Amino acid sequence: MPKLLAARVALILAAGLNLVPLAYTGLLIASGTSAGGDYDARLRFIAANPVMWSLGWVLWMGGTVGLVLSIWTLNRVMRDRPGSNATLLSLATVFAILGGASDIVGDAIQVTTYPTLAAQYVAGGDPGTQTTRLLFDLVDHLSTALSGGVANTLYFVAGVLVVIALARVGDFPRWITALGGVAWLATLGATPAIFFPSIAPVAVASALFLYSAWLGAIVIWGMGTRSTLASRFTSSAPRV
């Protein structure tokens, strides 16, 4: 597959892998999230829908892979462009991978531990119910810290490094640089917002929509009809 086409596909896929779980969560499993109510309501919802719940967080794991893929793709495609900084792009990839690792662990807790605790909560009586609620509270804070706190912060660092590196490419569109800056600032803003259930869904959705718009802008820019635009996404072929 030509390098230009591969880059387009990877960036579009990355956006889709994040928008799908966002929609799935909002439509199907929001009642089990921190925005869904108190612990009793959340646990009962998860206990009643364990497969649907776990599937949602498996989809979020796919979103994690997509985000790391997008940073890796931009590193691979843009590192040799005139003015770009390969060191910044490489560092961005490292931060994205570290963030992805933390995110995957947090999501894995959601997939495996939440349904188990929810089933125990529904089946048990006092004082077992209180113990289960305490464990759920601890696990909930841990998974939130890993996915929403640590991962989002590392993603922010990775994203900012990419934005800076791309901004140094001579005629890279400045409006895409600005859009990228806003997108990654929104990601940073979503980090504390996850601890406030009333605003968390809006903060996370805004960050992901802006991130996807940024990727889309890069894809469209790379799909320009002028050869000078398209050539930036193609490898330098040897001349004979």
Where are these regions (language model features)?
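Hydrophobic, aromatic-enriched alpha-helical segments typical of multi-pass transmembrane helices
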Residues: 1-240
